[in-house]
Amino acid sequence: MSLWSFAVFWFYLASFFVVGTLAAVLVLPFMAASLLFATGVVICGFFSNLSFRSAQLVYDQFVGTLQLTLQHMAEQVPPASDMQQPSGSTIDTGAMLAHTFDSSSYGATTQTGSGPESGPVPELGSEVSASPSPELAALPVAHKRSGRRTGTLASGM
């Protein structure tokens, strides 16, 4: 082995150790910080999942209670087919809608009586016909729902 080869070998070996040491000094702290932050992300993800699951459990427990409460509240609402006047007689809903669409002013209601059962009572006069107006007849007819309830209220948990 020549002297020149020997000097080049030591130069490359020293360069390798210097560059390796500088890289270790500069890179290893960033790698350690990266590992620390990655650990923090994993821990935060774990607690995020844990808090989501606990919130979902609380939500699932109260959904049934809320559905039952809403169902009981809905059962307390009187049917919308007939409206009670304060005198006790009923108003046909179709005639009331026909009056609403036939009248020139849509605010033709009066407030009579007092108490929770009194409300806006339409002024029904001779202009109300038994057949609905063309505007009302053009509206789509909603099919009457059966007595069996479907959907989220009846499905439970």
Curated annotation (Swiss-Prot):
GO terms for cellular component: membrane. Residues 1-7, 51-157 are cytoplasmic. It is found in: Membrane. Residues 104-157 are annotated as: Disordered. One of its GO terms (biological process) is sporulation resulting in formation of a cellular spore. The chain crosses the membrane at residues 8-28, 30-50. This is Outer spore wall protein 5. Involved in spore wall assembly. Belongs to the OSW5 family. Its main location: membrane. It is a multi-pass membrane protein. It comes from Eremothecium gossypii (strain ATCC 10895 / CBS 109.51 / FGSC 9923 / NRRL Y-1056). Residues 104-115 have a biased composition (Polar residues). Pfam families: Osw5. InterPro entries: Osw5 (IPR031430). Keywords: Membrane, Sporulation, Transmembrane, Transmembrane helix. Residues 29 are extracellular.
